[in-house]
Amino acid sequence: MENNIAKMIDHTLLKADATKAQIVKLCEEAKQYGFASVCVNPTWVATAAELLKGTDVKVCTVIGFPLGANTPETKAFETKNAIENGAAEVDMVINVGALKDGNDDLVERDIRAVVDVAKGKALVKVIIEACLLTEEEKVRACQLAVKAGADYVKTSTGFSTGGATPEDVALMRKTVGPNIGVKASGGVRDMQSAEAMIQAGATRIGTSSGVSIVEGKTANSNY
């Protein structure tokens, strides 16, 4: 089970004060444990891509992070730049305010701006920031992500008021159906919580506690 879970983990370091030495360590751990990817801020994509060259570990980065309040054009440029630097997966934050305003056209256009640039080059995961949404908004966000061509929906940035819950994961899985990925992130710190997310329907886990999870320990990070 540990090895299977390792292949579902995006080994994550998104804090503002991350140093090169920490990114190097992250990549070494990802190689050692066989994680699906490392998830790093855009400034570290080229470094991580170089460190992981010739391995199965992908480089994942974040777009419009963590607020999602950039314009679609900005998110599209961030995506293009990240892919050019070696990103194979991008986790973008939706325009949460637009969703709450009922401006579904803008939400969809915003996601599509990233999807269009990434098509055939990188997987797109759409962060809905579930902790800020009502049930109806969570469903609508997932529906818009699917409509815009996303590969995954993702619960949280890990930088807002809450992280992943099995209930949100189950709702997201029910909404998107079997063919779209669901990523649980934020507060997944041990094997028990990781397994709960997977049982609820998650196919990827975003966490900075990947090593603790596969070693059966508990970490104390929020992401």
UniProtKB/Swiss-Prot annotation:
It catalyses: 2-deoxy-D-ribose 5-phosphate = D-glyceraldehyde 3-phosphate + acetaldehyde. Its EC number is 4.1.2.4. It comes from the Bacteria. PANTHER family: DEOXYRIBOSE-PHOSPHATE ALDOLASE. Belongs to the DeoC/FbaB aldolase family. DeoC type 1 subfamily. This is Deoxyribose-phosphate aldolase. It is an enzyme of class 4 (lyase). GO terms for cellular component: cytoplasm. InterPro entries: Aldolase_TIM, DeoC, DeoC/FbaB/LacD_aldolase, DeoC_typeI. The active site is at residues 91, 154, 183. GO terms for molecular function: deoxyribose-phosphate aldolase activity. It is found in: Cytoplasm. Its main location: cytoplasm. Transmembrane segments: none annotated. The keyword Lyase applies. NCBIfam families: deoC. Keywords: Cytoplasm, Lyase, Schiff base. It comes from Geobacillus sp. (strain WCH70). Pathway: Carbohydrate degradation; 2-deoxy-D-ribose 1-phosphate degradation; D-glyceraldehyde 3-phosphate and acetaldehyde from 2-deoxy-alpha-D-ribose 1-phosphate: step 2/2.
